[in-house]
Regions:
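Structural recognition of alpha-helix starts/caps
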Residues: 300-302
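Flexible phosphate-sensing "switch/lid" loops adjacent to ATP/NTP-binding sites
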Residues: 1-295, 304-321, 329, 336-342, ...
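Cysteine-nucleophile active-site neighborhood
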Residues: 1-4, 318-393
């Protein structure tokens, strides 16, 4: 919304986990990593930022507790702190503040998201750092937005604001007073409940914004615009729009998504399909391809581990295309190869990415060229290596 009104924006993510980066984390734990233009493996949220804003992310836009501690310890080992006792405050919090300010050119706004939940031990240094940052940089130049969950109890047909009140109380106890509260809810929040949040959380009623379940995620910017979220942000900073906001692209996309009648089924076969975020970039690419072609893409996720030959015909019966993404390890490879064979014989459009393409070569070698023990030397040293590491050539 700020970008559409002529402002230059930078988006950043701070993750409280102790991993240095998400590159070596299991997709089951954290979903798929997002690779930035400069080659960094970062949190998948940076992918959401890029898709919504069309602003390219950099390695400097994502940091973790693990990276921060690693940097501080390396500096201490080199004598960078001149023998001082290294502590969370000020040394860790100073490093967090450096991250917020680092690599900024001529952006008007820097939006930093802190992962986790208020009250988590892991998040405390980040909350303390933004408290200090606001105090040092100026309260009129820093805006705190708190995202909170407002549950709807179906049994009693009521919305509960107590979790939000306690969350804000916890945040204020650390020294951070939210300026805007965004309330995530399944149902629209009645005015009297919003007034209650405003009263107990010390936030103006117009700054209590609801984000209700929408039919498609692309309706979210329109919803925020209708509630004047961008207007309240600019009002806080005493700024005016540089140009009139243009939400027609979002309205156009929403209209296509909601009114498209034609559907295509695309199967994704992989090891991590049980976690929706494990192949997030593929999901988004296919959905966006559907929008561009005025069709709804129905994604069928099939786990490769237990995929049997007898099941393939049934599971791939009505698919318009097959996608096998990247991966590693022997587990699930035979299921992928069997599915590729079926797609080739039935002339189903197929796309293999990285490991998926390697398995396509193995399948062709085995079933078309009749090389019975064809395989990858990465998985089996005794196979006929139609796929091999470059140092084995």
């Amino acid at each position: 919304l700020l970008k559409s009104q002529g402002y230059k924006v930078r988006l950043r993510k701070m993750d409280p986990y102790l991993n240095v980066d998400p590159g070596t984390m299991s997709p089951f734990q954290h979903g798929e990593v997002f690779v930035t233009d400069d080659g960094a493996e970062t949190d998948l949220d940076l992918g959401h930022y890029e898709r919504f804003t069309n602003i390219s992310s950099k390695q400097s836009d994502n940091i973790t507790t693990g990276r921060i501690y690693s940097d501080v310890i390396k500096k201490e080992r080199k004598g960078g702190y001149l023998g001082k006792t290294v502590q969370v405050i000020p040394h860790i919090t100073n490093r967090i503040k450096e991250f917020i300010k680092k690599d900024i050119t001529n952006e008007d706004f820097v939006i930093c998201e802190i992962g986790g939940t208020v009250g988590d031990i892991e998040s405390l240094p980040f909350v303390e750092a933004i408290r200090q940052f606001s105090n040092e940089y100026g309260k009129s130049k820093t805006l705190f937005i708190h995202l909170t969950f407002v549950p709807f109890l179906k049994s009693s047909d009521e919305i509960k604001t107590k979790p939000t009140q306690h969350s804000v109380k916890e945040l204020r106890g650390i020294g951070v007073q939210p300026d805007i509260i965004i309330c995530r809810s399944q149902q629209s929040i009645p005015l009297d409940q919003r007034k209650k949040i405003s009263l107990f959380c010390n936030v103006p009623i117009e700054n209590v914004i609801e984000t209700v379940d929408v039919r498609t995620i692309y309706e979210a910017p329109i919803s925020f615009y209708n509630q004047k979220l961008d207007k309240q942000v600019l009002k806080f900073f005493k700024l005016k729009p540089k140009k009139r906001a243009n939400l027609s692209p979002w309205k156009k996309i929403t209209k296509i998504v909601l009114n498209t009648k034609k559907t295509v089924n695309i199967a994704i076969i992989g090891k991590y399909v049980n976690l929706k975020d494990a192949y997030k970039s593929l999901d988004e690419a296919l959905v966006h391809g559907g929008i561009a072609n005025n069709v709804k893409v129905n994604l069928i996720r099939i786990e490769s581990d237990n995929l049997k030959n007898s099941e393939i015909k049934t599971k791939l019966k009505n698919v318009s295309g097959l996608l096998i993404p990247g991966g590693f390890g022997k587990r699930g490879t035979e299921g992928k190869i069997s599915a590729i064979k079926y797609a080739r014989e039935k002339k189903i459009p197929f796309l293999g990415i990285c490991f998926g393409m390697q398995m396509a070569i193995v399948e062709f070698a085995r079933n078309k060229l009749k090389i019975k023990n064809a395989g990858s030397s990465e998985l089996d040293k005794k196979c006929y290596p139609v796929i091999g590491l470059i140092n084995e050539w």
